[in-house]
């Protein structure tokens, strides 16, 4: 496998996981206020 492909898959997976996580954290912060 190419290193570029691994990097793209890794970044895509990171965005897929981090996206909803950030939204949940922001929602919880607003909820606690």
Curated annotation (Swiss-Prot):
It is found in: Plastid, Chloroplast thylakoid membrane. Keywords: Chloroplast, Membrane, Photosynthesis, Photosystem II, Plastid, Thylakoid, Transmembrane, Transmembrane helix. GO terms for biological process: photosynthesis. It comes from the Eukaryota. GO terms for cellular component: chloroplast thylakoid membrane; photosystem II. Pfam families: PSII_Ycf12 (PF05969). It is a single-pass membrane protein. The chain crosses the membrane at residues 5-25. PSII is composed of 1 copy each of membrane proteins PsbA, PsbB, PsbC, PsbD, PsbE, PsbF, PsbH, PsbI, PsbJ, PsbK, PsbL, PsbM, PsbT, PsbY, PsbZ, Psb30/Ycf12, peripheral proteins of the oxygen-evolving complex and a large number of cofactors. It forms dimeric complexes. Belongs to the Psb30/Ycf12 family. A core subunit of photosystem II (PSII), probably helps stabilize the reaction center. This is Photosystem II reaction center protein Psb30. It comes from Euglena stellata. The lineage of its organism: Eukaryota, Discoba, Euglenozoa, Euglenida, Spirocuta.
């Amino acid at each position: 496998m190419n290193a570029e492909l691994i990097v793209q898959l890794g970044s895509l997976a990171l965005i897929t996981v981090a996206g909803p996580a950030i939204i949940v954290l922001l929602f919880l912060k607003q909820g606690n206020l």
